[in-house]
């Protein structure tokens, strides 16, 4: 037989029924939720308050002496905000943001009706002094940022200018070297040309001398051959004349001419 599901009018009735069932089974249910929550708050809330007190000292140093009142709520808010900030941010920027957030919470507490201080004029003077101090601090930080930006820009500009000047000076320094190199190349070219011309002149002189020598030798050979030819002709002529005389004598003796 299936049990029908009970319906309860309130959570309290359901809780009482649950306790009865657990006790019938011999169990002791834990129903002190409020007590556990209070114990948790006492343990962890106290730690949070203790951890937040050193951060409240920073605000006490900024405010004038005798007018400082700590606010654990603002410090706990700053602590939670610091935990939520990303880890890559610098410590200086995170502190500045925490200071601004904590002081904004402090001003809200000053002007809100929740923590009504006994001396309202004193808190107003504290809030006004904080606003003046924060304005001066922001102005100084902005001036520092602008001066650092200007200094970095000036350094970069000077560096570029120096590089450009060095780039301009380098060709001027290299010009004499280039000129000397060009002059040396021209001298070498002239020397090469003079050597080539001297070689060609010597070659032409040699060729001309050889031609003259050959001509002289040819002429001498021609003269010698002509002399030999004349000598032969003369000898032949003389021989011819002698034969004719002999022939004439022979003819006279034999033939009777």
From Swiss-Prot:
Residues 163-176, 183-193, 200-212, 219-228 have a biased composition (Basic and acidic residues). The keyword Coiled coil applies. Residues 210-248 form a coiled coil. Residues 152-162 have a biased composition (Basic residues). Keywords: Coiled coil. Residues 145-257 are annotated as: Disordered. This is Lysine-rich coiled-coil protein 1. It comes from Bos taurus (Bovine).
């Amino acid at each position: 037989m299936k049990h029908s599901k009970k319906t309860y009018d309130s959570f309290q009735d359901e809780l009482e029924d649950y306790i009865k069932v657990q006790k019938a089974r011999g169990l002791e249910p834990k129903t002190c939720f409020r007590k556990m929550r209070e114990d948790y708050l006492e343990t962890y809330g106290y730690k949070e308050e203790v951890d937040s007190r050193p951060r409240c000292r920073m605000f006490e140093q900024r405010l004038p002496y005798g007018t400082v009142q700590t606010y654990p709520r603002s410090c706990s808010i700053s602590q939670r905000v610091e935990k939520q900030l990303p880890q890559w941010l610098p410590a200086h920027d995170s502190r500045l943001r925490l200071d601004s957030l904590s002081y904004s919470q402090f001003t809200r507490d000053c002007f809100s009706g929740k923590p009504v201080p006994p001396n309202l004029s004193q808190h107003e003077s504290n809030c006004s002094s904080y606003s003046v101090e924060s304005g001066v601090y922001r102005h100084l930080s902005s001036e520092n940022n602008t001066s650092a930006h200007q200094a970095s820009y000036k350094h970069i500009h000077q560096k570029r200018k120096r590089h450009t000047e060095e780039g301009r000076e380098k060709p001027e320094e290299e010009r004499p070297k280039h000129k000397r190199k060009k002059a040396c190349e021209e001298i070498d070219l002239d020397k090469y040309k003079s050597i080539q011309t001297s070689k060609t002149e010597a070659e032409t002189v040699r060729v001309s001398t050889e031609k003259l020598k050959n001509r002289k030798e040819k002429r001498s050979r021609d003269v010698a051959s002509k002399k030999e030819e004349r000598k032969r002709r003369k000898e032949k002529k003389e021989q011819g004349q002698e034969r004719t005389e002999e022939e004439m004598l022979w003819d006279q003796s034999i033939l009777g001419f």
